[in-house]
């Protein structure tokens, strides 16, 4: 064991191989990409669009330079006031009138542009959001093959641009080559070649070394000149329009050779260059300027150059040559799931595309205005309308599938969310269309995309995570680092080379755990290595590179699972996903058995406070740290106290430095949620015994000790936000007031003089948080009322109580109240005069029904809480804290939990924390050694006695310390009961789901169950008066209130609806008695309506906006597991 300094603590590491490379900054993918957008991306778009000329070519508008101003509000203010954290984008624009030669320059404001915060997130309308990276097929040329029923191979080549028309070349059974332009009907390929200017047949045959397949194709081609070829193409592309040579040429040029209409992007050009090997890459802007070395061309080329982003004739010719080569058996077809053919569009590029759409819309407006308005009075300011740009950006952040509400359950959830890769979204795949191949683990994922961490369910394999060391290159391909082998000396050097999936295919790469001498020479005769998709056993002399670290294959969440190497992949997947759902506990505790990456994960997640400069701490309080830096200046760090996260968990920072202490730059000076002295701390180390106990841990249930409840071991704070606004209505403004009709003084005791609850009040369901009255419609007044109105003035005006009350099943302490009003100059949405937000915090102790899990996918639900004295206890009298079922281990094959249990016990006994990095950690021998050192039994088992009787159990039991998490699926959020409540409009049945305060569905199968027992009356009652017999349920309620017998059920409303539906089909449906007399099914009686009002049941028909869905849909509730498959689109 090697002691490693982690922040202020020491961890003893079992690592066998040293870490060659530090972990990179984990949210670099977000920040670097956004920075690229600000520096380069915006400039690129302005360059593309500029200049905008009018239809006569007289006026032209150029975009020269741009800059972002200072943001108007800070991040905190934006969160508080529901604003977007953004800065004004100003652009220098020049308008040139070519007739008069007049030039007007102006600085124009192009709207507010959302800024990325320090943590790599955006604040949009007060909510913290993340833009995730999208995996899409890279532009370029792709070759594929199909085999027809006779066994003949047919080939297809497709040139896919970034935007523009597709060009496809295909062969048929007779080996003729055809071309399809933009998915239209096919033409012989020679027609396209003639149209491009290769007119003579001899010239075409020469281009392809007189290949017989081309000559055969020429025979199929009945055009004789360039003109005929152009017209033939035009007929295929625009059937029904009169073809002319001129329009045909223009069409073909604009389709493939016009940068405005066709764009391969830098990536597409690079991919064509790599695949076709034809040397077409750059356009040189100055042939004789200074030169520099270019790594792609391996040559010195002029510095002033740009990628050729449209198609060239060479591209088409070389593509056909490659196709001919494939038919001869040379070259190879592409695998579209290979990461060399899939690239990432990160924030910057996604924003750039959106901005481009906005600018293109604006360009149309500018052109129109140029034409309509008088040329002399025009200025850039008048021409430019910023609305389309602002709208495009708003649309992207507000409703794109890739802009997601940040998962903020805990720091790991935040970090992982920012590193997420999705194949879904605009221009990507759809869940229904994606087959198995796309979702599968591919050999090119190695070191780039984690094979473990992906959601279970419909998105499996479509949403992934970046691995720990991976980075994204300028073309959007994921690169992973390797150590270079110096072949001449046979030494593994510490030189790091980053390779993309394509480049890696050429090399033989050894694993990170090869045995090396101190000089870096291989110690083994043969080593394990990879080459492409194969695993080889090769002699060291053949190895080109060596992996940097075993961690490089896995994502951050996966790397946090100790002994991952002993867990089955399915369970590891659950473990990685469930760590993201752990709720932050009141008192955090770092794991005794960690993997050594906890510190880095917490530091980069953005929840802890880092010192900006080195210095000495001058003052520390709960909400602020003051440091005098080495320049003698004061740095103040405000800490976040009890703030609500997006998921309702609690964000709270606390200082971990003392007054007078010396701090260095980037040192962690304050802990955030779920961190302990700068280390990620998602759960607690608890003493666990693996044994059955009276059947209470059957089927993964968990038995816990009351100590965990009493000592607040698994207690978390949850904060809910309630909002109430006073609007202007047609009948007058709503008013927030303490004076509420028909409410006793008792209900108002915690409200202040404005009618808003005081901070610190304990509230229960139904309590008033904000008193509010709304004007009612004026009714005809009686003489007495008129008299009262005359005497008391306005006071007797009709108002109804629309106060904000605590919803069912919620309670807690009011921790914060925010009031915004128009009078105080706050910006509120139109029609709103006052807005009040109330925050209620709950302390939730662990309780029966809560979901808990370890880090190995071992999840379960708390089934019973036993008094401490009844728990099984160890020989020294220590009662265990949790009892897990041993049958949960063998079939699930997550043995890592047992090793963690043993090592945890030993480490706890020795009073140390250990790190066992994945695939590079403690071995069985190490664990035995640790147990021996701690004086514990070597097999990790010990005699345990029953707490109730003191008798020992039959066998010895595995006992040890395991890191357990409490997950966000808490029973308090799920439990729900209703007696009366809202009913659906059409069927008159209760709504479903907790969110609608609905009832429990008594479905088809449940009816069968009662039928099976012959419980006729129970069944009738459930299907009528407990559901949709409108008259019956009111009478029943009356009978219950008065203590009378329950009346006979009537006719269910849904039966009436059925009859009406049949009648609407034109069928004459009547209900008859035994004596063939027609039964009049009366509509709902008026007196019943009055009765209902009497019992306060009248308002129980659900309003349109209350009902999420008229008919009960499987749990309309909003508690689908956001974390399990969080992909931003909430179709689920």
UniProtKB/Swiss-Prot annotation:
InterPro entries: DNA-dir_RNA_pol_bsu_ext_1_sf, DNA-dir_RNA_pol_bsu_external_1, DNA-dir_RNA_pol_su2, DNA-dir_RNAP_su2_dom, DNA-dir_RNAP_su2_hyb_sf, RNA_pol_bsu_bac, RNA_pol_bsu_CS, RNA_pol_bsu_protrusion
SUPFAM superfamilies documented for this protein: beta and beta-prime subunits of DNA dependent RNA-polymerase (SSF64484)
Alphabetical list of Pfam families matching this protein: RNA_pol_Rpb2_1, RNA_pol_Rpb2_2, RNA_pol_Rpb2_3, RNA_pol_Rpb2_45, RNA_pol_Rpb2_6, RNA_pol_Rpb2_7
EC number of the protein: 2.7.7.6
GO process annotations (BP): DNA-templated transcription
Record GO terms (molecular function): DNA binding; DNA-directed RNA polymerase activity; ribonucleoside binding
GO CC annotation: DNA-directed RNA polymerase complex
Subunit annotation: The RNAP catalytic core consists of 2 alpha, 1 beta, 1 beta' and 1 omega subunit. When a sigma factor is associated with the core the holoenzyme is formed, which can initiate transcription.
Record function comment: DNA-dependent RNA polymerase catalyzes the transcription of DNA into RNA using the four ribonucleoside triphosphates as substrates.
Protein name from the UniProt record: DNA-directed RNA polymerase subunit beta
Lineage: Bacteria, Bacillati, Bacillota, Clostridia, Thermoanaerobacterales
Gene name of the encoded protein: rpoB
